[in-house]
């Protein structure tokens, strides 16, 4: 329905726009429709020694982002919590079987509590609504966190979605042949069905390893036919117990095409030496990738680092120079550039061990190793595989291994423009990656000072190992546990100290304690309801503060990254913390320093933690607004109600966590934006000019680059934001005025004079 409305809007827009056009505009549109296919083109290449502003901003090291808006994610989160058992498959995929069983128990207990309250509405309603609100809030937050992994649930509907494999690039302008594609399809079809109850992550981990082995054992044969083969992955009918997916490929070749394909197979096996030269293959490769980069690199989306197999095989291509197959790129004749964007090439070359005198390239689908990287260690291993090559062993966790199968099961239809952008992103990382540049750094082994050439990833690996070895405090975990226990027992304690004096507490009986615990005469339904409410409050409150502790730990790690990064150019502190040390005495060193800065800023959880912090921030504002409204309604009777006391406890605990996060975030920004480092390096350059006048011109150049870097960092750096929301300025101002107006009313009522906080400039 929505697509039909958009089509109707586009049609009417073009219709009324036709009345405004003049001859010059119509001629320009005709030129644009023809496209650039008839324009003369020259060979070109991208210079990897230059940097983009994305490197300084940090978007070069992109992170995963959801493909649907947050409003839809919120709606889906609420639906998945309200109808929790109906989405059991989804919850098992994004959590685990044990956690799902635990959450299912809490869900049924909450349903029983609501039913008992409707039957006997004697207990305070806040004791029932509190856990319910927490359940809805955390379910929505979790749905937004995992939205980068699965964007559509794999329900049992009748609409079976399809997903096309990316077109692979092979020899002289030809497609991958049918035999090899069929072998890959048969390899993929051997994926076994898995029962849900049999260890979800373990099963997916094993199946994915099996699938990768089956595909990687197949070589690549090429043919000369320019016709395109479209391998398609179909989703079978999914059942709650068993999920199977199957790949089918339809291809038609003539007899002449089969002969040419057989000839190229002999070439790949080393039978014939009539291979194209390496220079020809590299020239074609540069033309292909340049064309793709021009077409696709138009957005700044956060995309995941995918298809490590394809990048690994390209690294092998630099080592195996005698037996490389020629690459190709097929672009169908079309009337616009938009049609050619649907052809995304998965470029890969590699060699197979054990073949003397020749090697065969491995061409795989670009989605072969798609992962979501829920933890920072998995992402680091993918970086090593991506930038160093297959010799780096990647220890991918079960979460990232399961992400590929989950994505295939979801049947998500991806935008071809996004696929092209992801290819260009990987191509840039491969050709101008930080791992290709090295700096002469100083390391300490005991009391000895030694030099070695290190890349950005090697330096960052040492920094991350120091951060991981840091002993984290448990103060905020203890605070969360204390607040959890206090909120769980609060209704009982409130009734106890309100109805009993200190003298009466000494002689209180067990029956009276049970009555105060239930808040009503202790009949069986009331006792069951009170026990359920206590258990729900205890578990859900602990889960909420557990998420807060995760956010606090992440902010602490970000601060440690920034702290160690600021010590790299200091010899004394670098030796103290056992990290590499180098000076910004060369332009190349400045480039590596900026790359390391951007890389460390993007390490670890980003958007997922921002979702948690944003939710806590909005919850704190909501509670503050409710408390202000209650105080304005009657400040003398404000503390008579138990839920107002609960609001105050929640507000105090959340403010403590938010103050901690705000202090860590601001300190992290200060460490990364510390201009004194660059100023100190400029002073060092002047000192070197005085000692070595013959290098004055070179040192002056470096000094000018340092000045430009200082200005650029000041231009791009933004102040720390506690909430991860991109808020409209109008909505922000309205929210600020409403909240501050309520607080101003409370303060004016308590102090006796008018004060208007919203007029104070923030």
UniProtKB/Swiss-Prot annotation:
Residues 348-361 have a biased composition (Low complexity). The keyword Metal-binding does not apply. Residues 6-150 form the PHTF domain. The keyword Endoplasmic reticulum applies. Its main location: endoplasmic reticulum. Widely expressed with highest levels in testis. It is a multi-pass membrane protein. Residues 152-184, 344-380, 393-415 are annotated as: Disordered. Keywords: Endoplasmic reticulum, Glycoprotein, Golgi apparatus, Membrane, Phosphoprotein, Transmembrane, Transmembrane helix. The chain crosses the membrane at residues 77-97, 99-119, 121-141, 473-493, 512-532, 611-631, 645-665, 737-757. GO terms for cellular component: endoplasmic reticulum membrane; Golgi apparatus. Disulfide bonds: none annotated. Residues 365-376 have a biased composition (Basic and acidic residues). It comes from the Eukaryota. Glycans are attached at residues 179-180, 363, 431, 674, 733. The modification Phosphoserine is found at residues 272, 276-277, 334, 336. It is found in: Endoplasmic reticulum membrane; Golgi apparatus, cis-Golgi network membrane. Interacts with FEM1B. This is Protein PHTF1.
């Amino acid at each position: 329905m929505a697509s039909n409305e958009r089509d109707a809007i586009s049609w009417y827009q073009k219709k009324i726009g036709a009345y405004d056009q003049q001859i010059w505009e119509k001629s320009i549109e005709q030129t644009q429709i023809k496209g650039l296919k008839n324009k003369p083109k020259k060979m070109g290449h991208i210079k990897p020694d230059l940097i983009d502003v994305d490197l300084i901003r940090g978007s070069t090291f992109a992170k995963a982002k959801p493909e649907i808006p947050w409003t839809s994610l919120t709606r889906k989160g609420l639906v998945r919590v309200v109808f929790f058992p109906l989405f059991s498959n989804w919850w098992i995929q994004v959590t685990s079987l044990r956690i799902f069983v635990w959450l299912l128990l809490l869900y049924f207990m909450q349903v029983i509590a609501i039913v008992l309250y409707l039957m006997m509405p004697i207990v305070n309603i806040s004791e029932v609504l509190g856990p319910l609100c927490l359940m809805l809030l955390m379910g929505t937050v979790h749905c937004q966190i995992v939205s980068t992994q699965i964007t559509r649930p794999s329900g049992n509907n009748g609409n079976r979605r399809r997903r096309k494999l990316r077109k692979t690039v092979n020899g002289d302008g030809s497609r991958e042949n049918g035999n090899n594609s069929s072998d890959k399809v048969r390899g993929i079809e051997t994926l076994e069905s898995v029962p849900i109850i049999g260890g979800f992550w373990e099963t997916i981990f094993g199946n994915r390893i099996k699938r990768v082995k089956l595909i990687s054992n197949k070589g690549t044969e090429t043919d000369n036919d320019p016709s395109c083969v479209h391998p398609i992955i179909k989703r079978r009918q999914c059942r709650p117990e068993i999920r199977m997916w199957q790949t089918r490929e339809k291809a038609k070749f003539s007899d002449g095409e089969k002969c040419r394909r057989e000839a190229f197979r002999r070439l790949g096996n080393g039978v014939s030496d009539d291979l194209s030269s390496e220079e020809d293959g590299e020239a074609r490769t540069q033309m292909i990738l340049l064309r793709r980069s021009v077409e696709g690199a138009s957005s700044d989306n956060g995309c995941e680092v995918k298809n490590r197999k394809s990048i690994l095989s390209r690294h092998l291509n630099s080592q195996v120079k005698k037996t490389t197959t020629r690459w190709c790129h097929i672009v169908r004749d079309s009337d616009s550039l938009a049609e050619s964007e649907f052809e995304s090439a998965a470029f890969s070359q590699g060699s197979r061990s054990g073949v003397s005198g020749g090697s065969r390239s491995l061409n795989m689908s670009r989605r072969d190793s798609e992962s979501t990287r829920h933890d920072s260690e998995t992402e680091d291993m993918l970086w090593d595989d991506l930038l160093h090559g297959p010799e780096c062993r990647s220890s991918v966790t079960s979460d990232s291994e399961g992400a590929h199968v989950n994505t295939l099961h979801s049947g998500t239809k991806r935008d071809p423009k996004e696929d092209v952008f992801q290819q260009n992103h990987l191509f840039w990382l491969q050709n101008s990656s930080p791992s290709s540049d090295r700096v002469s750094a100083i390391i300490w082994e005991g009391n000895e000072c030694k030099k070695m050439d290190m890349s950005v990833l090697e330096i960052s690996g040492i920094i991350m190992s120091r951060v991981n070895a840091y002993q984290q405090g448990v103060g905020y975990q203890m605070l969360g546990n204390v607040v959890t226990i206090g909120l769980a027992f609060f209704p009982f304690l409130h009734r106890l100290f309100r109805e009993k004096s200190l003298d009466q507490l000494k002689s209180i009986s067990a029956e009276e304690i049970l009555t105060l615990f239930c808040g009503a005469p202790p009949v069986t339904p009331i006792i069951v309801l009170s026990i359920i409410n206590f258990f729900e409050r205890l578990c859900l409150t602990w889960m909420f503060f557990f998420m807060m502790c995760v956010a606090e730990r992440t902010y602490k790690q970000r601060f440690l990254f920034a702290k160690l990064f600021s010590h790299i150019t200091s010899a004394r502190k670098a030796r103290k913390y056992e990290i590499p040390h180098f000076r910004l005495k060369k332009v190349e060193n400045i480039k590596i320093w900026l790359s390391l800065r951007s890389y460390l800023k993007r390490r670890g959880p980003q958007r997922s933690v921002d979702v948690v912090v944003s939710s806590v921030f909005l919850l704190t504002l909501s509670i503050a607004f409710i408390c202000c409204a209650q105080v304005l309604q009657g400040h003398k009777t404000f503390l008579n109600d138990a839920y107002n006391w609960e609001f105050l406890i929640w507000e105090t605990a959340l403010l403590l966590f938010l103050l901690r996060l705000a202090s860590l975030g601001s300190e992290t920004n200060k460490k990364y934006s510390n201009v004194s480092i660059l100023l100190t390096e400029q002073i060092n350059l002047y000192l070197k000019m005085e000692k070595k006048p013959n290098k004055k011109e070179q040192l002056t150049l470096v000094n000018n680059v340092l000045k430009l870097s200082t200005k650029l960092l000041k231009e791009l750096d933004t102040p720390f934001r506690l909430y991860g929301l991109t808020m409209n300025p109008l909505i922000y101002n309205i929210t600020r005025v409403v909240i501050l107006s309520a607080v101003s009313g409370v303060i004016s009522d308590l102090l006796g004079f008018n004060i208007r906080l919203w007029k104070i400039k923030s």
